[in-house]
């Protein structure tokens, strides 16, 4: 489907690519994508939800059609500010009052970071008492901890040394850290990912270390969310440790509702039909159910 497009400015002069479908619905769904990819890989969100809600997709800085050095960020919290800029734009331009934050992978960390720590940027944008607060937060594959050998290495890095490494200005691009072959059981997803020039298969070490550092901070304490939270993860995810995701939300966010998809890889929305249908059923039972009931 056709989406309107805009470029909006950030607090520090970057330009964010935003696309949206505004059809006069009460609710908005704001989608934040994962690391190395871009919002164009999530047009299914607009196609799936447009009959129920307005939809906004955007590219984080350094990703897709937004400005900034490719696959790089100096401070991870800049991504949270990007989300804030998009929300502010929708509130001012379209008088948005009801919205759902939908996020995938690194985008889930961005969303959790913003909800947990928005007061650090002195943002009064989200305020429960003033009636401007998410109706729901939906997190797909939040990166509580990397999967496999990468996760094992990350867990052994003391916080002090992680802070030191993440503070280095020197950064190099490396490939192979993210096993994108296992995004989906559908091999075409991997092939299309490689062909897409807006994807980054090489990521800056600075970005990777900022992700690890921020994830450890955010997922070491409760998020402090005051709305329904739904979390979905596949049991065969090779990028995010599904066991660590389940453990965190059971221990520190017990009110969040977990949805574990058996045999699912990292991108459940791009899975083969027998697995993808489980994901779409979850969307029906959570986001669409909320929208229809309000």
Predicted features and spans:
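Active-site glycine-rich loops that stabilize anionic/oxyanionic intermediates
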Residues: 33-37, 106, 235
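Alpha/beta-hydrolase-fold enzymes
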Residues: 110-204
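Short alpha-helix in the alpha/beta-hydrolase fold that links the catalytic acid
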Residues: 227, 241-250
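Serine-hydrolase catalytic-loop signature spanning alpha/beta hydrolases and amidase-signature enzymes
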Residues: 34-44, 55
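Catalytic nucleophile-loop/oxyanion-hole region of alpha/beta-hydrolase
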Residues: 38, 65-94, 277-278
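Short beta-strand/loop motif that positions the catalytic acidic residue
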Residues: 225, 231-233, 237
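Catalytic histidine-centered segment of alpha/beta-hydrolase-like enzymes
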Residues: 264-277
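Conserved alpha/beta-hydrolase
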Residues: 46-69
